[in-house]
Amino acid sequence: LKAEEKKKQLEEFIRRFSANVAKSKQTTSRKKMLERLNVEEIRPSSRKYPGIIFTMEREPGNQILEVENLKAVDADGTVLFDHVNFNIEKGQKVVFLSRNPKAMTALFEIINGNRKADAGTYNWGITITTAYLPLDNTDFFNTDKNLVDWLSQYGPGNEVAMKGFLGRMLFKQEEVEKKVNVLSGGEKMRCMIARMQLQNANCLILDTPTNHLDLESIQAFNNNLVGFKGNILFSSHDHEFINTVADRIIELTPKGTIDKLMTYDDYIHDEQIKEQKAGMY
C-alpha cells in the first residue's frame, strides 16, 4: 500500500469512529500512526476484508410488512413508542431511529416474534423470509460446540462448506475448532453474520449491526447491503452506514412516527423535522 492510501485509510477510521467510545483506543493509536506517517515506515497493510455476500433464495412479492397501531412499553413502564403505523414497500432499506435505543430493539423483537406488542398488529407478506441480527446475541453462544458445528445448525452444507464460510469471515483453519463460548465480541458478530448469509432471506433485520466490528468488516458489510436487492430494516449508530444504506427513515416516538423518504443527512438538518420532533417526545 502506498503511503497516500494508508493515510486515507487512517483518516477514514478516525473520521468514522472519533465519536465512538468503544473504539476510542483504536482511534487514538491510529491518530498517532497518522502523525508519524513517513513513506519509509509504511508497510503493506495486512488487514483483510471479510467476504460478506447476502443472497436471496426467493424474490419477494409486493406485500412486505404492514404495521398498525403498534405500541411497546418498557419493563419500568416507559412508553418506548405508540401509534406506530407504516407499510414497507418492495426493495426499501429503512433505518429506524429514536431517542431511546430500546425502542428499535423492541420493534425488531416484536416483528421477529420474540416479544409481544403492548397494542397493535403487524403482518408479513407470504413471500417474505427474514434473517434477524439481534442486539444481544448471548443466547446463541451458550454452548460448547465448536465453530463448524455451531454454524452447521443454521444451514445445509457439509463440514467443508462450513469451513469455507468461516474462512470467508476471516476465521483461520485452526480457529474453526474453537468453542463458540470463548469467542470475543467481534468474533461472535462475524459468526452471526455468517449465520445470516446461510439463511438466504429476502428481508434483513439488523439491530445495531456494526457493534464489535472493525473498520474492514464494517466497510465490507456496508458495501454488500448497498447492493442487496431485498429489504433491510435496521438501526445503527454509524452515520456513514445509515447515510449509504437507508433510503427511508422512520423515527419511533411515544406519540407516533416521523416517516420520510430522504437521506439521513437531509433528515438531521431539516428544520421542520426538528420542530416536529420537539413535540413528540
Where are these regions (language model features)?
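ABC ATP-binding cassette signature C-motif
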Residues: 1, 57-281
